[in-house]
């Protein structure tokens, strides 16, 4: 859907010739006058934003670039140049405040900006605490004025991408109630997220109040005049303005002064604020809940991540192993933490499970959750936690916290609130890794339409297309590394951790109807995938909060916070679909939070939201049947034997030791084990709600032809009884 949305942006209405239009959006600035705010103190002077640097003809040009995604190729196109016309010079009420654009602060400097976000983006601030002077519609109300909120495909519905004041509103304002006295230190703004329109504020003032009736403004140190803060020059880039002096108040207002000509005063915002102690405040909210686990709750760049993983390995050397599956385009290693009672060894009958995070580098919560999970498992194992001990003794857990470390480093440098919605999403080749796996859906569906599945074309372990294996194929090194990893280890269960929504999506991710934007496209194992998705969603505290509002433009709670991926938006080349069709592994996508890159003060609560879900999901690998397929004569396991379940058109295969795991929901199943050179065997296997997979072992007997091949290959003579049997089978007499 993102590709469709971005492509449609090319057909958006042309932007007017001038930026920075004030108040009623008429070219030039109105004379300074009185700002009448209901219940406010009198007379605040308007101040125009400082005009941009002039070119030779008296105008300033800004090049806006948008990303157009066509199929799998990422193409960068230049939009039409936008001309900034210098407004008529007027005496301002005070000097313009210098903005702090995204990306200008190093991580260490970011800590000095003072306060963390109040919680507009993370939804910690409820809709009832957001107000405005006016709104164009309900879908453009103040509850939509949250940093990084995304609109739906259509404007004018209930889910538009900003707060927008009415055109007739002469003195627009957007107000946030912190709930109690708070130290405000800064403001971050964006324009309107829309496929069809360009709207953003170019300058604004800030006011404060303790009772929402008496207001005072933020002032410059040098002049003592009201400060005018320069805002945005495009819809998406977050712009941070630190206040000249932090202010303690309960309410904060943003008053747009100028905005894009031809547009409307529209903005999305986040407020930087610190709580303050006030013994007279009788309505103090309960402190934000966190976690009592002794874990490292902060964001980790590549160097810090390596250091943390090494510390965990040194603390728990008997249950951990760190290994690399390859390198990113920039040469950063893709590190995996393996956790098991026998790390580095595949034990017969012990399933392999994995979590993958950071496929999109700017979706940072999954990365931190996996780093927290490995710390937690180590800590609890040392404490003798029986649940953790059982997990580590019954399965091998593989944690890949950063599949796209290059993208993450870009996002980390920008900072959690300034990275925006998409920067750092792609790898350094501008490849979206979740569209980069081989499309195996199309050849499977074409073969099904021709009646070739499963007799001619298998319904599992589909081979890579020839084009995908060519040296010049557009396949990211990160993708190649993960595919090799999938082939090397017999994974059974996986989850791909993303961010930006609160929902669990399951395969298929790609619609069966070509070019359909969305369409319900279930797999043959739809019941299993729905179960897995429901287990995670039902164990996630945030997803189960019935009082929470939707993140952006869809309310997934009406479906239990799960959805078929293709019925949400089509994703050709997804890792989920590839994992299901190329390996034995069942994988879902978990969208962990409305905020892709939450501030680190949100991490303790996000850990509590997901801790039980992460553990419970891993335990689902016990659901279904498991066993070993052995050779009757040698009693050795048979590798690559096929396990077929009657009524489910998708098979799995045995690992190199002959062991297998087949995820199934409770019920009775007729299961067939077959292997080349062996007679097939079918038996009934019952799956119940009891813990642990139902043991369903098979012993296969070689066919006479296979026995003959093996004898001849060994140079032995064919026994008379076998020779006579073969001749009888051929219809010949001795």
Swiss-Prot record:
Organism: Homo sapiens
Glycosylation sites recorded in the entry for this protein: 57, 210, 220, 318, 428, 472
Residues annotated as transmembrane: none
Co-factor remark: Binds 1 zinc ion per subunit.
Cofactors required: Zn(2+)
Top EC class, one word: hydrolase
Domain Peptidase M14: 298-621
SMART domains membership: FA58C, Zn_pept
EC number: 3.4.17.-
Name listed for the protein in its UniProt record: Probable carboxypeptidase X1
Name of the coding gene: CPXM1
Record's subcellular location: Secreted
A Pfam family recorded for this sequence: CarboxypepD_reg
Binding-site residues for Zn(2+), renumbered to this chain: 360, 363, 498
Alphabetical UniProt keywords: Carboxypeptidase, Disulfide bond, Glycoprotein, Hydrolase, Metal-binding, Metalloprotease, Protease, Secreted, Signal, Zinc
